[in-house]
A protein has these predicted regions:
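Active-site helix-to-loop segments that bind/position phosphate- or nucleotide-bearing substrates
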Residues: 5-9, 14-227
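Short, acidic/turn-prone active-site loops that include or flank metal/cofactor-
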Residues: 1-3
Length: 227
């Protein structure tokens, strides 16, 4: 492991070559529809986080129905700004790697753990993490993990919100790392059943694989956060 990401991939599935070929040749129309479903699920979970903490989200909720094929109207970016301002305050600005802001450091660290969980599940199904649906970045060796983690980011946000809620001061330290590591056991609803997040991720990723292989499975089994 390096920075919570696997250095090597092991593929236990004997049909991996066939699966990866189908993954590499996925039609753009299917990719566009998958991405629409993924972004709708992300915004839905963000809304559940807001509602779960008593934050008025009526304006935010409308974004769920506005997501289009391939998110070609950019609803994800619009909704993200409002979401973070509602959750962490109007002055909060999301920053990526290199930030010195503790809250952003918390988020980035939590997301890196989540991404590693997703990557492990992806390789376990025989899919290849380098073949993304939406993300394509020469510096990202696992764009598929970056894609599939999107609906699960609110699980990290929720844990961090609860962690800082009643603290006047918080630091990136061992206590926080031990706390956020429990992301894998967070309560989740998938296929109308309660699961821990770790199990739900495997169900979710397997459903993506089935869509890629069969090309006629009508929906993704998407995890829903349970506050």
């Amino acid at each position: 492991m390096k920075n919570n990401n696997p250095l090597d991939y092991l593929y236990p599935n004997v049909q991996q070559t066939s699966i990866i070929n189908k993954q590499a040749n996925l039609k753009q129309t299917l990719k566009g529809n998958l991405w629409k479903s993924i972004i709708k699920a992300k915004i839905t979970n963000q809304n559940l986080v807001l509602e779960g903490h008593g934050i008025n989200s009526l304006r935010f909720k409308k974004y769920i129905s506005e997501v289009k094929y391939n998110d070609n109207t950019g609803i994800e970016a619009q909704s993200a700004k409002m979401y973070f301002n509602l959750l962490f305050g109007k002055d909060f600005k999301r920053e990526q790697q290199g930030t010195e802001d503790t809250l952003n450091i918390f988020l980035n660290y939590g997301y890196s753990i989540l991404r590693s969980i997703i990557a492990r599940s992806i390789t376990g199904t025989g899919l290849h993490p380098s073949l993304g649906i939406w993300h394509h970045n020469q510096y990202d060796p696992m764009p598929l993990a970056s894609d599939l983690m999107e609906p699960l980011r609110p699980f990290v946000d929720n844990m961090i919100y609860k962690y800082i809620k009643n603290k006047n001061d918080y630091k990136f330290n061992k206590e926080f790392k031990e706390y956020i590591a429990r992301i894998i056991i967070q309560p989740t609803i998938i296929k109308n059943k309660a699961q821990i997040l770790d199990n739900a991720v495997n169900i979710y990723v397997s459903s993506i694989k089935n869509i890629i292989i069969e090309k006629n499975k009508p929906y993704i089994d998407l995890p829903r956060i349970k506050i």
